[in-house]
Amino acid sequence: LQLMWRVLEKIKSENKTIKPLHVITTDTLVENPIVALWVNTSLDLLREKAQNEGLPIFPKLLTPNIQETFWVNLIGRGYPAPNTKFRWCTERMKIRPSDRFLRKLSAESGEAVLVVGTRKAESSNRAQSIAKFEKEATRENFNPHVNLSNVSSFLPIKDWSNDDVWLYLLQEKSPWGINNKDLLTMYQGATDGGECPLVVDTSTPSCGDSRFGCWVCTLVKQDKSMSAMVQNDSEKTWMEPLLQLRNNLNEKDHEKRDFRRLTGNVQLMPNDDEKSVPGPYLKKTREDWLEQLLKAQMKIRENKQLPEEIKNIQLISQEELDEIRNIWFYDKIEIDDSLPTICEKFAKGEYHFESLEDNHIFDFEILKILKDTCKDDEMIFEIAKGLLEVERKHFKSARRTGLFDEFENIFKKSFYKDRTDAIDYAKEKKKIKIAAEKQLPLTGTE
């Protein structure tokens, strides 16, 4: 970014036309709080200085759509914590926000060039990715964008080492006034041991080799950067609740998840017909994650070492909670509407919710009677409340289009007796499918 600033300064000094530079960064809403604070401060200074200097530089902080945030998907829909086999977070929270912005910008301007600070030295995967795009370059140093045909990517520092980056940043002051030494200190604090040694050969670790990411990231075994921050600086121990919650998310969770997929289907494990592929988090688990999140928020705010700038840190927004509540109540037909009660218990007065009384088919006492009538059989209870909720939804409709399809979907999802019955049913379906493919006669129980 500093290099691009200097380029625009030179173009301006030569009285040439300067094309606008949009500085975009994506806030996933679960960024490391220290990093998020530094980024926001830098963008504010950048915006002010660019205006004063008459440079067409426009900082833009992008965020995911409310339906695609981490907590709406995990607590709301019950998506399990991301892993290498189900990495649902990156596309929704990082790629789509920038793609939407670039698509809009390129449509308005005809084309756009995306200048990225990606470097080969970051990782072997990054080096392979850059090498691949270099082969596909339409012109020297310009690569086609993966998703957008009228956007090109330019990587000006792709061959720089970590030391090259730090040497430049410490020798060249930031034009917009952010202190690069503060950035060095932040990386130093996130490095194991808290040291930035003088690099004398390739065996010496470089400063800033740590990578900052989302504090909830479970794609790695350990959040080394945040752990190092807490370990190296006693004033950052307030982040410990974040580390603890992140570690809880990373624990084995099969018992916390439904034996059915979101669609209600039961899928057997590839190498074990006695187990089903776990589906979304169970209702109790989702409620527990919300409780843990609000407790962490409360504990952080109570810490006297919390920086003044983030004393009112909010780990989940009102908008996210409203979306989660709608998913629980309308999509999952969890008509006990437990979210406001949980929020009031663990974040009293922090969040406010409109009444859903007009949408309730029963009050909670009647709901309890219904559950008692089902003799605590969760499958029967699911069917009963599901059918009644569908009927409520269509009650005032002159035409009840889709009513019977919704009834059928309720039965398809919950007609099993229990987990064992569901697995037996899936095994029988698999057996029938194999027999049909082989055109063999069926044998077995009726």
Which residue stretches match the model-derived regions?
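Nucleotide-activated chemistry modules centered on ATP-dependent adenylation/adenylyltransferase
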Residues: 1-446
